[in-house]
Amino acid sequence: MTFMAIEIPEFIVPFVPWIRGTVGLVLVGAIFLGGMAAVWIERKLSADIQLRYGPSRVGKFGLLQLVADAIKLFTKEDVRPGNADRFLYDNAPVFMLTSLFLMLVAIPVGAVFIDGNLYPLAVTEMDISILFIEAVSAINIFGIFMAAYGSNNKYSLLGAFRNFARMIGYEVPLGIAIVSVAVMTGSLNIIDITSAQGSFVWNIFLQPIGFVVFFIALMADLGRLPFDQNESEEELVAGWVTEYTGMRFGLVFFAEYMHMILGSFLVALLFLGGWNVPAFVANNAVLGLIAPTGILLLKTVLVLMTIIGMRWAVPRFRIDQVVDMSWKKLLPLSLLNLAWAVGLGLYLGA
């Protein structure tokens, strides 16, 4: 049997889907634990930037602070506004987490090399996985609308309107940047896009403009500084999450950090070579099992730390500046990059 152009011994054939799916699910569970780790990383990194200690009293390096925060969230009173729409208010966090679950189905979270052959670790493999990821990530906005409208609060609704304006403007260049990578590779499968980059010919070098456009648009999609106009504390209290407390707030908070981690994975897979390692590593019996996933996770953590560090490096933009930048700067740059990708793809294909 041939699997992804790889010859697989016949006795393994019946177990290939189960092995990949099981390992993929285990890594997906590990990524959820990574959502908690991302909170600790942000606290420590922010403290380092501000010349503070950060969490240091609860356990070694403050690691048990996460447990303390979880206990606090579990024990806080869950207050629902009296005039809220119960169905929309209660189900908005679940809707947002569902979007993240669907993204995790298609994103490969690692890979192994056995006898030099590549075996990506993903729950499933889709020929149009990159379009699927883009589509299900965009439906997160409906969860935000449900939370804002269901809260029946003016600050929540104003925060959601700002979120709509920002996401409409930045989803377009984000999508074009993804299409540019797919056009040059000749595939909509994120596994093929990652594998095509090889060990050193990463898309960040072939499409530097596309990388800049994608990263800025991703930051806007995440709603991180300088693009957090939807929850600017000085103007809108907490934006569309103003009325959320207890575990419902915890779910929204967790979804935000999970979105950050998945966005970091996409940057690493699409532009930074993903799991690709030199041939001598791939052909090594031990390193081929460990190094690819380790390299991908290292790149993901570095991207995550960059996103977190941006919070303290740049000031918040006004909402009109954000909208102007998307339509007047990023959109033309993304179209220019698309033309470059088409030409480069034709040249490399020739």
Swiss-Prot record:
EC identifiers of the protein: 1.5.98.3
BP GO terms, sorted: aerobic respiration; methanogenesis; methanol metabolic process
TM ranges: 21-41, 94-114, 128-148, 173-193, 200-220, 261-281, 288-308, 330-350
Subcellular location: Cell membrane
PROSITE patterns: COMPLEX1_ND1_1
Keyword flag Oxidoreductase: yes
Keywords (A to Z) from UniProt: Cell membrane, Electron transport, Membrane, Methanogenesis, Methanol utilization, Oxidoreductase, Transmembrane, Transmembrane helix, Transport
Keyword Protease appears in the UniProt entry: no
Gene Ontology MF term list: Methanosarcina-phenazine hydrogenase activity; NADH dehydrogenase activity; reduced coenzyme F420 dehydrogenase activity
Catalysis: reaction(s): methanophenazine + reduced coenzyme F420-(gamma-L-Glu)(n) = dihydromethanophenazine + oxidized coenzyme F420-(gamma-L-Glu)(n) + H(+)
Any matching Pfam family: NADHdh
Any one GO CC term of the record: plasma membrane
InterPro entries: F420H2_dehydrogenase_H, NADH_UbQ_OxRdtase_su1/FPO, NADH_UbQ_OxRdtase_su1_CS
Principal localisation: membrane
Highest taxon, organism lineage: Archaea
pH dependence: Optimum pH is 8.5.
Record's bilayer topology term: Multi-pass membrane protein
Temperature profile: Optimum temperature is 39 degrees Celsius.
Family listed: Belongs to the complex I subunit 1 family.
Entry function: Component of the F(420)H(2) dehydrogenase (FPO complex) which is part of the energy-conserving F(420)H(2):heterodisulfide oxidoreductase system. The membrane-bound electron transfer system of the complex plays an important role in the metabolism of methylotrophic methanogens when the organisms grow on methanol or methylamines. Catalyzes the oxidation of methanophenazine to dihydromethanophenazine. It shuttles electrons from F(420)H(2), via FAD and iron-sulfur (Fe-S) centers, to methanophenazine (an electron carrier in the membrane).
Assembly and binders: The FPO complex is composed of at least 13 different subunits. FpoA, FpoH, FpoJ, FpoK, FpoL, FpoM and FpoN proteins constitute the membrane sector of the complex.
Name of the molecule in the record: F(420)H(2) dehydrogenase subunit H
Lineage of producing organism: Archaea, Methanobacteriati, Methanobacteriota, Stenosarchaea group, Methanomicrobia
Name of the encoding gene: fpoH
